[in-house]
């Protein structure tokens, strides 16, 4: 199913720094990194942007009431495992209570028809197995980040089951994505931004868990899935108001070392230093996404190699010409659309 018909609906992503689309209003914190894709690509020029914190309910309520969106894509989060250990209170307040703020404001705003809550592949209880996690597997979370996102899932489930019908009847879904890579991320303690900083600064890269297996996935594949899901909700498909895994094909579940080696082959290979991790991490993490493939007709068209090469290409081109961030991004969006048209699902 194409998301193109949906993109013209009035929409409001919470965490607008992460969104592409049309007719968009956004609520997000001020950019926290330098550089920032939101600034470099002049994202604010194309949307109605509100700088605010979802931990403040009045801010969320007022922004949603002012813009009256039909669709809310809730991306706002404290997304870093490392920071969740340093500041667990902020992590739980943002990820769990912030989700409640978004959903409470959504159900009290008559125009809102759909909310897609973006969580993570880390919401599942760690079974230390090689199989992909399915939507019905138990939630869990040993580290504060994973636990806070599992809490957000329960908040959304409560609103979906009972509170939405006591408001405007908004349809609510949870979308659980794989490990996201792609251009424009400069966060700390993430493998691709760390790789880019190592290459551009001519520094070594430190790998904490080179054997950890993750479902690497391009950000555009996830945006594609979120828009397809949102389109179903806006159309009134109550069956879509559920939990959904959006994971890559099996070949994309590779370890950290594989990712770094492919990035190096696509650009430049920095010196690698192996270091012990300062916090526990899951050894194997993979999503089973048959449900989205079968019922939403969604499958990402990019292989692991294509995903990594496209990511390296974005950063390489940006490093050569930072002023061209918007055009680099638009070219890659068109590349992804061409891949969908050419390959369809696979």
Where are these regions (language model features)?
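N-terminal Rossmann-like NAD(P)+-binding domain of SDR-like oxidoreductases, especially those catalyzing
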Residues: 1-177, 181, 335-336
């Amino acid at each position: 199913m194409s998301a193109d018909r949906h993109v013209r609906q009035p929409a409001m992503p919470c965490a607008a720094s992460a969104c592409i689309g049309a007719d968009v209003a956004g609520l997000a914190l001020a950019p926290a990194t330098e550089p920032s894709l939101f600034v470099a690509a002049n994202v604010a020029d194309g949307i109605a942007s509100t700088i605010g914190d979802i931990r403040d309910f009045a801010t969320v309520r007022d922004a949603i009431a002012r813009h009256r969106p039909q669709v809310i894509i809730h991306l706002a989060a404290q997304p870093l495992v490392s920071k969740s250990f340093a500041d667990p209170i902020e992590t739980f307040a943002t990820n769990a209570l912030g989700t409640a703020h978004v959903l409470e404001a959504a159900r009290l705003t008559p125009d809102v028809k759909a909310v897609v809550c973006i969580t993570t592949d880390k919401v599942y209880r760690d079974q230390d197995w090689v199989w992909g996690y399915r939507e019905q597997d138990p939630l869990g979370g040993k580290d504060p980040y994973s636990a806070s996102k599992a809490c957000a899932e329960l908040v959304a489930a409560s609103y979906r089951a009972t509170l939405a019908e006591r408001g405007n009847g908004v349809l609510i879904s949870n979308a659980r994505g794989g490990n996201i890579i792609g251009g424009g991320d400069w966060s700390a303690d993430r493998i691709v931004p760390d790789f880019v900083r190592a290459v551009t600064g001519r520094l070594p890269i430190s790998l904490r868990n080179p054997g950890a297996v993750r479902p690497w996935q391009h950000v555009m594949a996830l945006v594609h899935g979120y828009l397809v899901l949102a389109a179903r909700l806006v159309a009134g498909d109550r069956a879509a108001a559920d939990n959904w895994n959006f994971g890559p094909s099996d070949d994309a579940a590779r370890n950290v070392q594989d990712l770094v080696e492919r990035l190096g082959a696509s650009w430049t290979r920095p010196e690698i230093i192996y270091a012990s991790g300062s916090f526990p991490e899951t050894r194997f993490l993979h999503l089973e996404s048959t449900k989205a493939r079968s019922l939403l007709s969604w499958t990402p068209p990019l292989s692991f190699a294509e995903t990594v090469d496209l990511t390296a290409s974005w950063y390489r081109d940006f490093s050569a010409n930072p002023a061209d961030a918007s055009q680099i991004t638009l070219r890659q969006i068109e590349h992804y659309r061409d891949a969908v048209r050419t390959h369809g699902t696979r």
